[in-house]
Design a protein with these regions (language model features):
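A short, hydrophobic C-terminal helix/tail in secreted or cell-surface proteins
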Residues: 176-180
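Core alpha/beta nucleotide-donor-binding catalytic domains of modification enzymes
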Residues: 2-23, 27-175
Length: 180
């Protein structure tokens, strides 16, 4: 499993290029940052603060992951209000991340196979035309999604096998329900 995950992540990356990983503190970006950091010194990470209920915990984890990997890391504000919609947070995140990129850098995000399938069905339910059903593109000139063919379960297993620390998003939402 380990070698397959690593091969899938690095197969479309040119290790001579400069990369910025969108580091959320979750398993997807933690595994992505860990594998890419082992392959190239040309990596830094960015965390986007969304000012949501658990942003501080996610930011702490992202900082810890970057520190453990010894990569440059920066946290940036989105200026969103608490309880902003997923769409607003996503749009703000991409705007901030693209603004942060230098001309010679490529953004890496932790979108997985699960995200790809979810996006496909959301687009289908919206009545998107055939072109829109392609779901999430794996590569654009300034963006790579190396985890797009990997399931979240496989990433969780990889993280456990390799002692990669991350914050489980499900635990945050579960604790929300317990708080209410």
């Amino acid at each position: 499993m380990t070698n397959k995950i690593e091969k899938d992540i690095i197969k479309n990356l040119d290790t001579s290029k400069n990369y910025v990983v969108a580091l959320s503190g979750g398993v997807d970006s933690a595994v992505l940052a860990t594998v890419v950091a082992q392959q190239t010194p040309n990596l830094r990470s960015v965390f986007v603060r969304h000012n949501q209920k658990h942003s501080d915990k996610l930011e702490e984890m992202a900082n810890r992951i970057a520190d453990n990997l010894k990569i440059n890391h920066k946290a940036l504000d989105s200026n969103l209000k608490e309880n902003s919609s997923e769409t607003k947070m996503r749009d703000a995140r991409y705007e901030i991340l693209y603004d942060e990129l230098n001309d010679d850098e490529i953004l890496l995000t932790g979108h997985t196979l699960s995200d790809k399938v979810e996006t496909f069905f959301i687009n289908l339910l919206r009545g998107t035309r055939v072109r829109g059903l392609k779901s999430i593109p794996k590569m654009t000139p300034r963006l790579r999604r190396p985890l797009l063919e990997i399931s979240k379960d496989n990433l969780i297993n990889y993280a456990k096998e390799n002692n990669i620390e991350y914050l489980d998003d499900c635990l945050l939402y579960t604790s929300d329900a317990a708080d209410e």
